[in-house]
Amino acid sequence: MRMRALGLMAAALGGLIPLVLILGGCGDKGAAQQKQATEITKGIEDYLALIEVPGQPLRLRHDKVTVTPSEDGKSYLVAITGLRYGTETAAMAAFGEVDYRLTPEGDDQYQVGDLKMPNEVSVAGKDGKPEATVKFETTAFSAIWSKPLQNFLKFDWQVKDIVASAADQPGELFKIATASVTGDGKESGKGLLDQISKLTLSGFTATDPQDGTSFKLDTLIGNVSFEKLDFPAYRQMMAKINTFSTKYAQPTDGSAGGGATPDAPKLTEEDSKALADLVRGFPKLMSAYGYDFSAEGLTMTNARGDVLMHLTHGGLALGVKGIDTDHAEAHFGIQHDGLTVNGPMFEDPLARATLPTSGNLDLVMTDLPVPSLVESVAQAIPELTSADPQVAQGAQFMLMGGLMSALSQSTIKLRIDPSALETEKARLTADGELKLAMQTPQKAVGAVNFALVGLDDLMALATGLANENPEAAQAVQMMQMLQSLSQRETGGDGKPVDKFKLDLTEAGQVLVNGKSLEEIAP
């Protein structure tokens, strides 16, 4: 449990920086190129030590870093050999050697170019047996590295013809026509970094070898951004986490006798306090973080080529700002458009009429009590990372209690920005605002407004099917209840609109248009 928690912390922090950071270089400009090369080598080794997480048995590894002054007298040739992912004795993914050129640009930056790396990566299982091969071709690479920040300010990696093949079966697991990873950042002063990283994939295809089901995706775009990332503090925190991971790693040498695995070292009181302080410091690393993904043209077909599902567009977004303040704000959004599903289930007219072909949900949560929530985690983290299962389980209850206490004293609000679901026969919209109220039965108070267009059409369809379809009969009863609760108006297009105001009261009542659900519900 301890190592899982430490590993998750390292992964969460490490996920802020693209894996391509291994390609960077550092070092201050010296009078002699050889001295500069030595400094660059040390900088690369130091950074690799951070992202390789030495305390984890399964991790990124390398053999050696070599930096050589080039013949032009200005740039440096860098070679990282033995790059791989796996255990100390077995590589699950072998990347081989990565070479590139560093060219000083002013006093604080390097241009990174002339990337050379294998165009084939072998993937193996934990037993070392080959499982798959991934082939690709790099078409372009460029980057600008900041020496003060020890990170990329800009990078652009373009790849094409990505093909993955299994070792034990013919054919291809998946193909990607083109892919790119780009980043655009700027230093906002005092070691703070603002950056947006973007991943773009196009022409993705894959086939399930078991049943022949095929997947096709025209485009996938993902963005990850952060603001005012304190890079010096980030490096220090990563170094401390790596120290903890190494110091309290689970032994694997069987020294406990009888081939048993010995217990991990017990966390000292001093290290328990240090680990808790690490958690408390996490919100100060940055002011905002967010990501979003969007997909275009997702199609699934069976072995005969029949379209089982198609989605024209889908998207997901999550962002948090004010992380370094007492009251943060979070946004969550999800949307889709052009959804069609074929199959026996959707031969039923009612199922087809109620399939949400498009929709969106936009939520904004304000007044998140960052300090009190983080303090709850900090107090529980030493026990959560305990190797004793009973202690770790007790810490989970302690954490839940601390979080509930923090929430009960907060003023969190949830705002539902205009959201909607649309089907073949109807359209439902919603908006409103709720406030957290842990003392009430529903744990919230406030109001949400709903508007439904097409209730009459759905009722007519369900009524016509009710005699032969039990589910349609149940739907009729539900829609009759909705009609009894509705406040009907006429929309701008002349169609009837059934409106519902859902109120959660301080007294614990649930009201719909002023009527109590307890009195109406059967």
Task: Place the predicted regions along the sequence by residue.
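Glycine-rich, small/hydroxylated-residue low-complexity segments
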Residues: 27-522
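C-terminal motif of bacterial Sec signal peptides marking the signal peptidase cleavage site
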Residues: 22-25
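Bacterial N-terminal signal peptides that target proteins for export
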Residues: 1-14
